């Protein structure tokens, strides 16, 4: 019987607490995680080369640990040779005069038309974008500068604006509405407002200011009259009317800000108080809500430089004072001059204080779903129509500060001959402000919107101004010209009011985001904006005080 090899029983480890071997012998083989789908570019690489910038992760591992085995493109310098071009063959005298001017001219024609493969030899290198000195001088230098300007304009970092109010941590965000959603809203068939109470008196417009032109300019005077910008809850007439009629109360400035919010770039805020079925749209005390913006919608808005006369805040103060002085200067002021008086006196009169003559109209609108809006609107003056009728005016002023810095049309050159170009430039740079003025005129029922063109005497003097001309429009027609849809404006207001009506009684705040096209609704405590600390943080001079200085 054949002998068999002896059977040696192997040693088997027994795992009492699981399955598999209890320990792994040390084989001195390094382990590295890998993926079978990775493409191997090299077997090994002892030096790490610079990765390709455009496709740096083309052969990278999905695990990210065995990148030394990935493929990276390397230039082979073994076949690189330097070529000495200093000893190039000179052209013959008879060729130098005929050939080289044609090269330059053909290169220019080739660069302008962009046709053909280019000339051979030196001409081909120049026309085809070569690196000769001639191409750098005539074509490549200008093109690179143009591309550089466009590149920096396109990739320039966006300017971060500050919010009009400091958002507190204890404020609750209720709603965020983007402008594209608001632009789709519409509330048609809103009839013209009905007058409830009319107060104040109006002076007649001086028609001599319609004859002002560039050759007959007139200096802008400083008027000592005071304008009170009383908010909604402090208006005694609105307090009286809120007891018997209406459930939404506001002023024309607040309504215009909300209805034209999709055109605004700067931050603003509106305080809302809900008491039962009544909603009051209000503004914060000592806020910059009443300041007029300058070049808000321009491609290059004013910079926020402290101490500069061309900063955003300084220009806003200047524009507000110009608008106030112009609105009073163009009126026929005097005790012997006639006035148009409304049914009730000015509700904001104070003894010993000379107030500007303004006419206030408290009107109401039916917004549907038992929503009745009551708002205070105003007129700045009156004028006698062609048939002897009285027409109400809304008088506003556009101001020019520095046409070169503002990248706009220079008024002193084109205001008389190309007034349409000047107005188009203002519509581009101040679209939101003009839309607000138009909405205020439409809400008040003004027959005409009178615009004045006021400019600095010199660009560096922000205290002296001259009136260069005036222009008038019908508010409804001007709204059509600037593409202002009143149905959309009413829809935006109705949307925000409906959102607030669904909330419990309390205090709310609508804030325009300073850097995004959206508005936010916050639920804020009742004591917000009441403490002295809040007034110090949001300190700004009241509009009435600024007019006294």
Curated annotation (Swiss-Prot):
Compositional bias (Acidic residues): 529-539
Region described as RNA gate: 288-302
Keywords (A to Z) from UniProt: Cytoplasm, Initiation factor, Protein biosynthesis, RNA-binding
Record InterPro entries: eIF3d (IPR007783)
Primary localization class, coarse: cytoplasm
HAMAP family in alphabetical order: eIF3d (MF_03003)
PANTHER family in the record: EUKARYOTIC TRANSLATION INITIATION FACTOR 3 SUBUNIT 7, EUKARYOTIC TRANSLATION INITIATION FACTOR 3 SUBUNIT D
Function: mRNA cap-binding component of the eukaryotic translation initiation factor 3 (eIF-3) complex, which is involved in protein synthesis of a specialized repertoire of mRNAs and, together with other initiation factors, stimulates binding of mRNA and methionyl-tRNAi to the 40S ribosome. The eIF-3 complex specifically targets and initiates translation of a subset of mRNAs involved in cell proliferation. In the eIF-3 complex, eif3d specifically recognizes and binds the 7-methylguanosine cap of a subset of mRNAs.
UniProt-recorded name of the protein: Eukaryotic translation initiation factor 3 subunit D-2
Provenance organism: Drosophila ananassae (Fruit fly)
Lineage: Eukaryota, Metazoa, Ecdysozoa, Arthropoda, Hexapoda
GN (gene name): eIF3d2
């Amino acid at each position: 019987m054949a002998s068999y090899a002896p059977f040696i029983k192997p040693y088997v480890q027994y795992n009492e607490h699981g399955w598999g071997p209890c320990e792994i012998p040390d084989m001195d083989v390094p382990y590295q995680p890998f993926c079978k789908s990775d493409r191997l570019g090299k077997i090994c690489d002892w030096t790490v080369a610079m990765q390709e910038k455009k496709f740096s992760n083309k052969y990278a591992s999905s695990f990210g640990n065995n990148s030394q085995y990935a493929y990276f493109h390397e230039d082979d310098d073994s076949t690189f040779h330097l070529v000495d071009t200093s000893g190039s063959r000179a052209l013959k005298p008879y060729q130098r005069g005929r050939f080289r001017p044609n090269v330059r001219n053909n290169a220019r024609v080739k660069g302008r038309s962009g046709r053909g493969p280019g000339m051979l030899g030196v001409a081909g290198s120049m026309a085809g974008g070569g690196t000769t000195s001639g191409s750098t001088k005539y074509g490549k230098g200008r093109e690179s500068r143009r591309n550089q300007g466009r590149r920096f304009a396109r990739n320039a970092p966006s300017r971060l604006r500050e919010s009009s109010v400091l958002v507190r941590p204890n404020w609750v965000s209720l709603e965020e509405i983007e402008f594209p959603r608001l632009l789709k809203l519409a509330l048609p068939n809103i009839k013209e407002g009905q007058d409830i109470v009319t107060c104040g008196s109006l002076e007649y417009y001086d028609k001599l200011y319609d004859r002002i032109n560039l050759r007959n300019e007139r200096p802008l005077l400083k008027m000592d009259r005071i304008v009170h910008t009383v908010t909604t809850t402090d208006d005694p007439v609105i307090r009286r009317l809120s007891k018997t009629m209406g459930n939404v109360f506001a002023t024309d400035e607040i309504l215009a800000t909300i209805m034209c919010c999709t055109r605004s770039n700067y931050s603003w805020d509106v305080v809302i108080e809900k008491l039962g079925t009544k909603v009051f749209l209000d503004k914060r005390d000592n806020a910059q809500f009443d300041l007029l913006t300058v070049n808000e919608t321009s491609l290059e808005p004013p910079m926020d430089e402290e101490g500069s006369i061309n900063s955003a805040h300084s220009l806003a103060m200047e524009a507000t004072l110009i608008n106030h002085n112009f609105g009073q200067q163009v009126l026929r002021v005097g005790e012997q001059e006639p006035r148009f008086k409304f049914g009730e006196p000015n509700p904001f009169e104070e003894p010993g204080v000379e107030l500007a003559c303004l006419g206030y109209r408290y009107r109401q609108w039916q917004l549907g779903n038992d929503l009745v809006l009551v708002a205070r609107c105003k007129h700045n003056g009156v004028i006698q129509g062609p048939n002897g009728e009285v027409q109400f005016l809304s008088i506003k002023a556009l101001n020019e500060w520095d046409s070169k810095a503002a990248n706009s049309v220079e008024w002193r050159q084109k205001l008389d001959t190309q007034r349409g170009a000047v107005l188009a430039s203002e519509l581009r740079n101040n679209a939101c402000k003009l839309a607000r003025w138009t909405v205020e005129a439409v809400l008040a029922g003004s027959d005409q919107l009178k615009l004045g063109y006021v400019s600095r005497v010199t660009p560096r003097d922000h205290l002296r101004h001259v009136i260069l001309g005036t222009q008038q429009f019908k508010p409804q027609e001007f709204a059509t010209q600037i593409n202002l849809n009143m149905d959309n404006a009413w829809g935006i207001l109705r949307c925000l009011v409906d959102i607030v009506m669904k909330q419990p009684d309390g205090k709310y705040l609508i804030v325009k985001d300073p850097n995004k096209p959206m508005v936010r609704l916050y639920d804020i405590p009742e004591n917000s904006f009441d403490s002295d600390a809040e007034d110090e943080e949001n300190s700004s001079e009241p509009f009435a005080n600024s007019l006294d200085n």
